[in-house]
Amino acid sequence: MKNLQITAYMQHFIRQQVMPGDICIDATMGNGNDTALLSQLAGKRGRVLAFDIQKQALEHTKERLKRDNCPENYQLLLESHENMDVYAGTETVSCITFNLGYLPGGDHSVATRADSSIRAVESGLKLLKKGGLMTLCIYSGGDTGYQERDEMLAFIRQLDPHKYLVILSEYANRPNNPPIPVLIIKL
């Protein structure tokens, strides 16, 4: 693996998971990197739902999807990720990805929050089919990042081990609160 950024690390697992025809969710659309990857992997027969509360994220993602010639299998939603269960059925989703924090290049005062992110993860876990994958990139710092990190880690640690496998990784030798990669597999 040449690119050692957390997003590339997580996309390695996403590539192993998503097959043509799958239903996928990008819970935090951002600049559209994961949305584009999910769209390409799911292919013409697949479906991708992407959520963000910032219009700027939606516009950046539209541009990215067009630039990458992604199949038109996506729905970009200007809505909170905690409402994803309105758009997908229980145990139908193969992969859900989250990048918690703020929009890169955007307003740092607008960021994900622990309460809505935990509700979104809870909702997403119900949507995942057996064998489905949820990825979380937990960025800390900023005004609410430490609180979100701590509350999210406490939440995922209490998930039923008979229903979910939670793999928590860390950058052991990186300074300044490096992001935390988390994989959750529905058993």
Q: Each predicted region: which residue ranges?
A:
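Conserved SAM-binding motif I beta-strand of class I
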Residues: 47-52
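Helix-to-beta-strand junctions that scaffold the AdoMet/dcAdoMet cofactor pocket
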Residues: 19, 42-43, 128-130
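Mobile active-site "lid"/loop adjacent to the S-adenosyl-L-methionine
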Residues: 98-120
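Class I S-adenosyl-L-methionine
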Residues: 148-187
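Conserved SAM-binding loop of SAM-dependent methyltransferases across substrates and taxa
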Residues: 31-45
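S-adenosyl-L-methionine
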Residues: 1-22, 36, 40, 58-91
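Conserved beta-strand signature within the Rossmann-like core of class I S-adenosyl-L-methionine
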Residues: 28, 120, 127, 131-138
